[in-house]
Amino acid sequence: MPDVSSPRDVPRDDLQADPPAVDLTTTVVVVLGTPAATRTEDHRALADLVARLTGVTAASVSLSQVCPNCAQPGHGPLRVQLAGAPDGSPTAHVSLARAGGRLALAVTAAGPVGIDLESVAALARAPLADVLLSAAEADAVAALHPRAATAAVTAIWTAKEAVLKAAGVGLRVDPRDLTIAWETPGAPGSDAAHPRLAGWPNAPFLLNELHLMRVATPPEFAATVAVVCARRPRLRLLPNPA
């Protein structure tokens, strides 16, 4: 089971604190905080986090986005460039999500990463089931009581968004092509259940190399992080209480 800190609302000032030493090749680091006024400032906060986790200067870290579909800059997967990094240095992978006045950042060198953060109330108001659920998921959700069904749909949505971000394709892929199952007995989306990618016919990676981890959040939010790598990484939520 991943090492997840207790849910807490992390003030933006905490993003400036020096994080403890962590092996990014075996760990995915997640920070929850408050978004800045602009997307550019949020990207700078993510770049600063990469700098502190990798031990380089902030000036040596830059982020870029180029859409793999239209080849235009300014949108698409976030990529990290480390100026002057030694040959053979692990590649840092990053992801970012915003929802309901909150921000989630993810950094790892284990492999491509995607994170999704959602407002539970906002998703509950949206008619998602018809555009989100595979046939197997729809059957599982239909068997649940309404409150449990809402939690399940929220968990499935954040898991699929995280997977599609890690794959670098986003919502250009129909979410219904993916099927999320649950490793632990319990209702989908419950605290006792852990998601896994059970099906995606055109996945750009082996399904057993996609690792999903639910992130501890305040109760009004839900978050999931996905990492593509051979071995399941450890999840570290910062700031991490001593």
Enumerate the predicted regions with their spans.
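Core catalytic alpha/beta fold that binds nucleotide/phospho-ligands
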Residues: 1-242
